[in-house]
């Protein structure tokens, strides 16, 4: 740990200072060129074991962390929960103790329950990185989104960012609100009343139920999918009606700033929260760039969180 980033784990954006977030973004910048080069290998994590323990289905995030670990030279092990003791009734604490006994040097965790990552982090001896826990947080997604915005816009402070869609069930929304407001952006959240968390203003976001009003003059428009797997009731009449009221179309995008950036954490539901013509726009869409920045951000986080274990000077 050092003054630049004095945290042992990265379980969320909450509690991070502006300079700590900016430090991680700056660290990520150095990996972008490597990832675009023909040879993409760095061996600074050689000999270290990274366990990706995903208790919830994932393709994109798991692949991104696996690529990040391997490009840094780590031995990467992906834990398949379907074949694990968790399916046989093992408690989360037992799983944490088992992982700890395997002497991993870093554990990346995704779990369907909010707070599960922190519980495991409290029980293990190595750094833990949150890859998404329930509705709580998804810190590396917020970091890669902030990096994408900074690279495309040149800054974050003073920008108006509209986060639109299923805010209620979105850990991405929560982490982005925390990161972007901490870095000086004005964050709007746009959703129907049934998909808007209560007292969202306490997080520093400005709520809108009217999609058009929320888009007015926005510098960045971030769309979120409907998380049907987290819905246990009738939150909206139908995907078709949601699209009619809250789908981002070329016409609606005209209400935002002329050079507004379009973002989406994926996976997208084309024709529901966003049309293909907007998602694939050659100059305004940054969706594929977000994926690219994700690998760089995760490489930076793996590097930073293991510096103490590797004996890097200044990281006692």
Swiss-Prot record:
PROSITE patterns reported in the protein's UniProt record: CARBAMOYLTRANSFERASE (PS00097)
EC number: 2.1.3.2
Domain of life: Bacteria
EC class name: transferase
Residues where L-aspartate binds: 88, 171, 225
Binding-site list for carbamoyl phosphate: 60-61, 110, 138, 141, 266-267
GO biological process terms held by the UniProt record: 'de novo' pyrimidine nucleobase biosynthetic process; 'de novo' UMP biosynthetic process; amino acid metabolic process
InterPro entries according to UniProt: Asp/Orn_carbamoyltranf_P-bd, Asp/Orn_carbamoylTrfase, Asp/Orn_carbamoylTrfase_sf, Asp_carbamoyltransf, Asp_carbamoyltransf_Asp/Orn-bd
GO molecular function: amino acid binding; aspartate carbamoyltransferase activity
Pfam families: OTCace, OTCace_N
GO cellular component: cytosol
Keywords, alphabetical: Pyrimidine biosynthesis, Transferase
Pathway participation: Pyrimidine metabolism; UMP biosynthesis via de novo pathway; (S)-dihydroorotate from bicarbonate: step 2/3
Keyword Transferase tagged: yes
Reactions catalysed according to its record: carbamoyl phosphate + L-aspartate = N-carbamoyl-L-aspartate + phosphate + H(+)
NCBIfam families documented for this protein: asp_carb_tr, PRK00856.1
Family in the record: Belongs to the aspartate/ornithine carbamoyltransferase superfamily. ATCase family.
Quaternary structure and interacting proteins, as annotated: Heterododecamer (2C3:3R2) of six catalytic PyrB chains organized as two trimers (C3), and six regulatory PyrI chains organized as three dimers (R2).
Its biological purpose: Catalyzes the condensation of carbamoyl phosphate and aspartate to form carbamoyl aspartate and inorganic phosphate, the committed step in the de novo pyrimidine nucleotide biosynthesis pathway.
Name used for this protein in its record: Aspartate carbamoyltransferase catalytic subunit
Organism per entry: Rhizorhabdus wittichii (strain DSM 6014 / CCUG 31198 / JCM 15750 / NBRC 105917 / EY 4224 / RW1) (Sphingomonas wittichii)
Lineage summary: Bacteria, Pseudomonadati, Pseudomonadota, Alphaproteobacteria, Sphingomonadales
């Amino acid at each position: 740990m050092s003054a630049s980033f004095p945290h042992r784990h990265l379980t969320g954006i909450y509690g991070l200072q502006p300079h700590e977030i900016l430090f991680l973004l700056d660290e990520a910048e150095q990996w972008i060129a490597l990832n675009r080069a023909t040879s993409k290998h760095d061996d600074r994590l050689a000999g270290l074991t990274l366990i990706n323990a995903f208790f919830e289905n994932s393709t994109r995030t798991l692949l991104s962390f696996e690529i990040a670990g391997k490009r840094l030279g780590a031995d990467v092990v992906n834990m398949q929960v379907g074949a694990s003791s968790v399916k046989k009734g093992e408690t989360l604490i037992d799983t944490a103790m088992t992982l700890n006994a395997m002497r991993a040097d870093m554990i990346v965790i995704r779990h369907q329950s909010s707070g599960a990552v922190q519980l495991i982090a409290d029980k293990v001896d190595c750094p833990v990185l949150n890859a998404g826990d329930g509705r709580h947080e998804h810190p590396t997604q917020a970091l890669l989104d902030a990096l994408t915005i900074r690279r495309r816009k040149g800054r974050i402070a003073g920008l108006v960012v509209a986060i639109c869609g299923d805010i209620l069930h979105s850990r991405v929304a929560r982490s982005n609100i925390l990161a972007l407001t901490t870095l000086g952006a004005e964050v709007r959240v746009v959703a129907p009343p049934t998909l808007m968390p209560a007292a969202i203003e306490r997080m520093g976001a400005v709520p809108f139920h009217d999609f058009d009003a929320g888009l007015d003059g926005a510098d960045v428009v971030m769309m979120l999918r409907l998380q049907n797997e987290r819905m246990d009731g009738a939150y909206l009449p139908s995907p078709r009606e949601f699209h009619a009221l809250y789908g981002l179309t070329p016409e609606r995008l005209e209400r935002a700033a002329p050079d507004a950036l379009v973002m989406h954490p994926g996976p997208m539901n084309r024709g529901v929260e966003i049309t293909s013509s907007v998602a694939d726009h050659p100059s305004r869409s940054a969706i594929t760039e977000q994926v690219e920045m994700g690998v760089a951000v995760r490489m930076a986080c793996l590097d930073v969180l293991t510096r103490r274990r590797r004996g890097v000077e200044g990281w006692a």
